[in-house]
Amino acid sequence: MPPDADQIERVLGPAGLLARSLEGFEFRESQLAMARLIDRGLTEGRQVLIEAGTGTGKTLGYLTPIVLSGKKAVISTGTKNLQEQIAHKDVPLLARATGMEIDAMLMKGRANYLCLQRYRQAAATPDLLGKATARVWKRMDRWLQETEFADRSELDWLADEDPFWDSVSATSEQCLGARCLHYDDCFLNALRREAAASRIVIVNHHLFFADLMVKRSGFGEILPRFQVGVMDEAHNVENTATAYFGERVSTNQLSDLVADAERAVRAAGDDPDFERKPLERALGAIRSAAEAIRGFFRERPERGTLDDPARAFLRDETVEVLRRELERVQERCGLDRSDDPVLHGFSARAGNLARALMVILESDDPDWLAWYERRKTGVQLHASPLDVSGPLREHLYDSLETLVLTSATLATDGDFHYVRSRLGLGENLLEGIYESHFDFASQTLMYVPRDLPLPSRPDFADRVAERIDELLRISRGRALVLFTSYHNLNRVHQRLARDFPYPLYRQGEAPRSVLLNRFTRNIHSVLLATGSFWQGVDVPGETLSCLVVDKLPFDSPGDPLVAARMNAIRARGDNPFMDYQLPAAIIALKQGLGRLVRSSADRGVLAVLDARIVTARYGGQFFRSLPDMPLRHALEAVAAFFQDDADSTSAGRPVSP
């Protein structure tokens, strides 16, 4: 039976079970209203779209009606941190408060778990792992005797950047399935059995969509069947769906296939039934083709469409060889007389790569884009849908009783028009916008200088670097500086590196987790970052007291996927800037602001160094989408804000917990 409103209030109300069991509980009307809206969605079998600002108590707002309903649910998040919070904090808290036994299971992406087949294979050829010592192997063997699911996070002694884990982790490409010698002892299989028996399974978006694709293929499933889906941090859904509904082939995949196959060939020894020479020749040809692809794209922009010159290259003999040799590997490894499950696994991998390559090269559908991406480690070739609304309706919306999509950043200018159109959400939709519980008027200050040049001016980067230097000295470090390009990031780093008095960290110097750990530990440090640091950074307290944004975060029209989507919007007679670029930038800026205020005790300055937010006609949409914050244009106001903090601290009132 679905819960009624009284049941929900008995848990979340001002005198409810949470209030009685949780010291310092603060009743939030918005949390109760959100839970009631979701309860209605569960009862009526409807989709629910919710923006719940920071401090709303969003996770308990959806957990409560779902738990009370008794329905089987999968909760998907954009970040591992939120997964951990739900599983290890929110679910136990709700269980203690209600006295209910909540059967919940945390399930991460497969690369977070050890593969016994790869581990045994690596142990048989330890020379291939370089620095992995006998001591490491001994500790791993002992751990495998004790662990339940072989989760990477249990190995706190193994550094994040240690390449050892990449050699033994579970991957979809290298999974042998039921053919595997360790199938019965597989940690992932044990994890899935546990998940199948759980009422609530907590995953991330990548695993959620990987499951959709497996179910779409008709060959099994990763997650158990469920009635209710919750997409938390749903502002990421379009990007994740684009990746999973599309196709991708990378030079790294090709190189990994060759390396793994060569390792298996060596392990096969002198088996008389195994013809190694033809396979070795095919692997050598694949390696050469991968190098040719890297070489061709080395002199091209980092991202671009597969234009005529690129297609001409990809269709020449190099890629024809690649396709032919992949098929040859598939044939040689899949021969009936070979009963080696590892070789059959290589056959499947080679076949999948050959098929994906065909899709990418022969893609001429105007609703899809064939494009490439050049990274430090290699080249990726993509075929991506320009619109994911159709596949989402077919494979997600129509398969669930109720789907809840929620985030702190979904609405723009007070409505959900943008996210509804991008995700293809129907009319039978329940909507709710619940403002942040935090007092931005007293906790924050927004600084927008009027004396800086516009981003289109050639002196913008130098002038912004000077102003950031001034700001960070006023804030005494304690800042995250977010850029829309590496060019400006490097320009600012070059200036600050001369004589900046506080610890300075730059994205790319170390893995993301290492940088965030250093930044969090050192209160007066500064982190310069771009890209992924616009979201998913949780640093409450004084360490992050100033958030600086160099430019409004518009997606670059030079990005191939952005450009193609803009062209598609223009072709149907709509305005790509107003309908796509602007709302996406508003959501990105809201995400950035979410890094600054993470608790009711946090105080901080948001500095937007792009005057267009106050001078352009569209600037009002940014302000109407952000919480009410005092707006100032002079550095003296920033100094006064931080002086007030200093005075409050010296008077005995803590600024942060």
Label each PLM-derived region with a short phrase.
Residues 2-50:
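Conserved pre-motif I regulatory segment
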Residues 166-201, 212-220, 328-452, 459-466, ...:
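A contiguous, basic/glycine-rich beta-loop/short-helix subdomain that forms a polymer-engagement track
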